[in-house]
C-alpha cells in the first residue's frame, strides 16, 4: 500500500512539472483511447485538440473538453467520401469551417501561395502570405488545420477569380518546434522521470515494466531520432513491435509484409520521383518473413543504401536519410534457434543467410525480452502529445552526440569500422532521447555504451555462426580512459561474458579447443541431444555447415 502511495506521489510530481514546463503539449492518454475508438482521425490530431481543451485535473472541465472535441470533430472533420456534400453546404451557407490536411506551395510565376486540401480535394486555393511564413510546416509536407472558408461567386470574375477563400487558418498540429524550450524543460526532470514521460507519450505504462524493459522500448525509438539507422527486432507476437511506427509517429511508414519494388522503395525512373526512403524519416517492414523484391537487384540496392545512405539509379546517385526497421515474429524459442540455426532465421533465405546484408544491421533488439502487452501495460496518465513528441524527435535528428564516447572511453580492438559506426549511432540515439539537453555524467554515458555494444554484439554473434571465422572478433569491449581498464560486454542469451561458463556444464555439453576450416584455433562447444526417432545418429553441424 505504501509503495502504491509513493508511485502516486511521484506521478503527481511529474504531472505538475509537465504542466509547468510543457503546458498545452501534454495530454491524458486514456482520453485518447476513449475518443479514438469512435473517430477516424490521426492520433496526433486528436491529442492536440485534447491538449487544448482537457489540460486540467478537474473532472468537469475534462468532461466538458471531451464533449467539445467530439463536437468539433463531428461538425468539421472532412471525410473524403463526403467532400462534395461539404462543398455544397459551403456554397449554400456562404461559409463553413473544416478540419483537413493543408499543404501550401509557392507559384513562382504568379508570385503567390496556394493551398491544397487533402480530403476535400481542393487545389490552388489562394492563401495569405502570413500563414506559410508563420507556420513553416505548411510548406514541408503539410499539417492538419481548422480552416474557416468563405464562398463568393462573382460573375464578372468567373474567368480568373476563385470563389473559395480562406478567412482564417488555425493549425491543430504543432506548427513549429522550439528545440531550445525542450532542452530547457528537460533540465527539470531526472533521468528516470524523463524515461517514464517518453514511455507514457507512446502509450506505455512504465510502472508495469522493469528497468531493462524500459530501455528496450526506448531502443525502438532510435530509428526515429537517428538518420540512416538499421534496426532489427524479432520476437513473440503481441509485444507491440510495429505499433510505434504505425500509430505514434506521422513521420514513419509501416510496409506490411509482401512484395515491394525498387521504384516504390527507392526511385521510380519512369516518373523521376524518389520512393519511400526519400519521403519518410523511417521505413519499417512488418513480418520480415514475407519480404520479396520483384526486381532481381532489389536486395543489392537495399544493401547499398543500408551501408551508405545512398543508392545508384540510372546515371546518378541519390541520397536519403530514412532509417530502416525490420520487425517479425519468432516461432520457436530463442534457445532452439541458437542451437539449430541463427536469430536471423525468420528472414527470407536471400536475406537471412546473406552475411553482407546482415552485417549492415546496426542493432538487434531482443524482442523476446519484452512482455506480451496486457491492459495494465497501457497508460492512463499524462504524456506528450504524439505530434509534439514526433516533431521534437525529428528536430533532434539534426543534433550529434555520438562523439561523446571519446570524452571518457575508447572502443576495444575487436570492433571493426562497421561495429564502431553502429555503436556510435546507437549511443547518439540514446543520448538524444534521454539527455536532449546534452548534460550527462560519465556513468550515464557508460550505461548507454554498454547497451549499444550488447545490441551490436548480438548481430556479430549471429554473423559468426553464419560466416564462420571471418567474424571471429565478437568479444566487444570498451576502455576507460581514466584508469585504462578494459570492460567486456556480453549478450544475455549467450550465457554470460566468459568464453567458457564457470561451474559444471549442462548435460550433453563439452568445450574443446581445435583448429577450424581456416586453420585458426578456436573454442568449440559440442552438444548432444536425444529426440524420439528410429535410433539413427545425425550430425546437425555448426551453424549452416551440416558437415562440420
Segments (PLM) and residue ranges:
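Structural recognition of the conserved hydrophobic beta-strand(s) that form the central parallel beta-sheet
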Residues: 233, 284-286, 320-340, 363-364
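Conserved Walker
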Residues: 269-273, 307-322, 338, 346-354
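P-loop NTPase catalytic core of nucleic-acid-dependent motor ATPases
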Residues: 173-251
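Conserved P-loop NTPase/AAA+ ATPase motor core
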Residues: 491-548
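Extended, charged/polar low-complexity intrinsically disordered regions
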Residues: 2-201
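Conserved NTP phosphate-binding and transfer environment spanning the P-loop NTPase/kinase superfamily
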Residues: 52, 362-492
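Post-Walker A helix-loop "phosphate-sensing" segment adjacent to the P-loop in P-loop NTPases
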Residues: 227, 250-260, 310
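Conserved nucleotide-sensing/catalytic segment adjacent to the nucleotide-binding pocket
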Residues: 268-316
Amino acid at each position: 500500500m505504501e509503495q502504491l502511495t509513493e508511485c502516486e506521489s511521484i506521478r503527481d510530481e511529474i504531472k505538475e512539472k509537465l504542466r509547468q514546463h510543457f503546458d498545452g503539449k501534454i495530454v491524458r492518454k486514456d482520453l485518447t483511447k476513449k475518443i479514438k475508438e469512435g473517430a477516424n482521425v490521426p492520433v496526433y490530431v486528436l491529442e492536440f485538440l485534447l491538449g487544448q481543451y482537457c489540460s486540467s485535473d478537474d473532472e468537469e472541465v475534462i468532461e466538458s473538453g471531451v464533449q467539445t472535441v467530439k463536437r468539433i470533430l463531428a461538425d468539421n472533420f472532412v471525410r473524403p467520401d463526403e467532400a462534395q456534400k461539404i462543398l455544397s453546404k459551403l456554397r449554400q451557407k456562404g461559409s463553413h469551417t473544416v478540419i483537413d490536411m493543408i499543404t501550401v506551395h509557392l507559384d513562382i510565376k504568379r508570385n503567390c501561395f496556394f493551398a491544397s486540401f487533402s480530403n476535400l480535394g481542393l487545389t490552388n486555393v489562394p492563401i495569405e502570405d502570413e500563414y506559410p511564413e508563420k507556420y513553416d510546416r505548411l510548406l514541408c509536407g503539410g499539417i492538419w488545420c481548422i480552416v474557416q472558408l468563405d464562398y463568393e461567386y462573382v460573375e464578372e470574375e468567373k474567368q480568373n477569380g476563385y470563389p473559395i477563400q480562406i478567412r482564417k487558418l488555425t493549425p491543430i498540429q504543432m506548427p513549429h518546434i522550439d528545440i531550445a524550450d525542450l532542452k530547457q524543460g528537460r533540465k527539470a526532470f531526472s533521468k528516470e522521470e524523463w524515461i517514464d514521460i517518453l514511455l507514457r507519450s507512446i502509450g506505455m505504462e512504465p510502472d508495469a515494466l522493469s528497468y531493462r524493459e524500459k530501455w528496450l522500448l526506448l531502443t525502438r525509438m532510435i530509428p526515429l531520432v537517428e538518420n540512416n539507422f538499421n534496426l532489427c527486432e524479432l520476437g513473440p507476437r503481441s509485444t507491440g513491435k510495429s505499433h510505434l511506427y504505425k500509430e505514434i509517429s506521422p513521420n514513419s511508414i509501416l510496409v506490411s509484409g509482401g512484395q515491394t519494388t525498387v521504384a516504390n522503395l527507392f526511385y521510380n525512373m519512369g516518373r523521376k520521383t524518389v520512393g519511400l526512403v526519400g519521403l519518410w524519416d523511417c521505413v519499417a517492414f512488418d513480418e520480415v518473413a514475407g519480404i520479396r523484391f520483384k526486381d532481381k537487384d532489389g536486395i543489392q540496392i537495399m544493401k547499398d543504401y543500408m551501408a551508405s545512405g545512398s543508392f545508384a539509379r540510372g546515371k546518378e546517385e541519390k541520397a536519403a536519410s530514412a532509417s530502416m526497421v525490420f520487425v517479425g515474429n519468432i516461432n520457436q524459442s530463442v534457445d532452439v534457434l541458437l542451437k539449430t540455426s541463427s536469430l536471423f532465421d525468420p528472414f527470407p533465405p536471400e536475406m537471412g543467410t546473406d552475411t553482407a546484408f546482415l552485417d549492415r544491421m546496426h542493432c538487434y533488439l531482443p524482442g523476446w525480452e519484452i512482455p506480451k502487452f496486457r491492459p495494465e501495460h497501457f497508460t492512463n496518465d499524462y504524456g506528450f502529445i504524439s505530434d509534439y513528441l514526433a516533431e521534437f524527435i525529428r528536430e533532434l535528428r539534426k543534433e550529434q552526440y555520438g562523439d561523446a564516447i571519446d570524452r571518457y572511453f575508447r572502443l576495444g580492438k575487436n570492433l571493426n569500422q562497421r561495429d564502431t559506426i553502429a555503436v556510435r549511432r546507437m549511443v547518439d540515439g540514446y543520448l538524444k532521447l534521454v539527455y536532449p539537453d546534452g548534460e550527462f555524467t560519465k556513468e550515464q554515458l557508460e550505461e548507454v555504451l554498454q547497451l549499444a555494444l550488447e545490441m551490436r554484439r548480438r548481430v556479430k554473434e549471429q554473423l559468426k555462426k553464419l560466416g564462420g571465422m571471418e567474424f571471429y572478433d565478437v568479444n566487444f569491449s570498451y576502455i576507460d580512459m581514466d584508469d585504462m581498464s578494459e570492460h567486456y560486454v556480453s549478450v544475455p542469451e549467450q550465457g554470460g561474458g566468459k568464453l567458457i561458463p564457470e561451474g559444471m556444464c549442462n548435460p550433453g555439453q563439452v568445450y574443446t579447443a581445435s583448429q577450424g576450416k581456416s586453420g585458426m584455433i578456436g573454442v568449440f562447444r559440442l552438444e548432444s541431444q536425444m529426440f524420439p526417432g528410429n535410433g539413427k545418429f545425425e550430425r546437425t553441424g555448426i551453424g549452416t555447415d551440416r558437415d562440420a
